[in-house]
Amino acid sequence: DMLPKEMIPLVKGMFTEKPFIEGPWMDKYNGKYYLQYACPGAEYNVYADGVYVSGSPLGPFTLAENNPYSYHAGGFMPGAGHGSTMWDLSGNLWHTSTMRISVNHQFERRVGIWRAGFDADGELFCNQRYGDWPVAVSEKKTDAWENPQWYLLSYKKSVEASSYEKGKEPALAVDEDATTWWQSGTKDGWLKLDLQKEYDVRAI
């Protein structure tokens, strides 16, 4: 009774004798091999990537301490599973994974990219604190934990519209959810957003 109905098949699948994991990817760092995998549940917000570690590419592997290392359960577009980890030309580590939408199809997804790295204990991590906000990409070495330069200003702010279709109200334009949206009831519709104070706006 504690679980939402849509989560029950996922939990049952995890505790059967035939669970499934997919999306293997391996990186080598400081003599260790990091075997990454996608946890079950691409259609859920908790879709994530885990990692095993070994001194040999053929194992034996040990489950890392900080699993899942790629996990983004909320925000505009949740989910962070079935991905790859790679260095750019400046020596920065990045992790890409798929993020859930599941509106037009159960497995409808998009690709997200986040800063990643290895901590002092050799644990692979992925910084998803502001996981779906813009992140600057430069041609220099950067701190994987630095905050984004741009912040979300519109979340749940006051909004008006010329009209709307039922179920597509103006408030859905600022609810930080990729699966909902405002839709005008006419061809020449408009939307007005009040940020309630003056801001330096960089993107709409």
What is the predicted role of each segment?
Residues 1-3, 52-60, 117-124:
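Short loop/turn segments immediately following beta-strands, especially the blade-tip
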Residues 27-29, 86-88, 119:
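Structural WD40 beta-propeller signal
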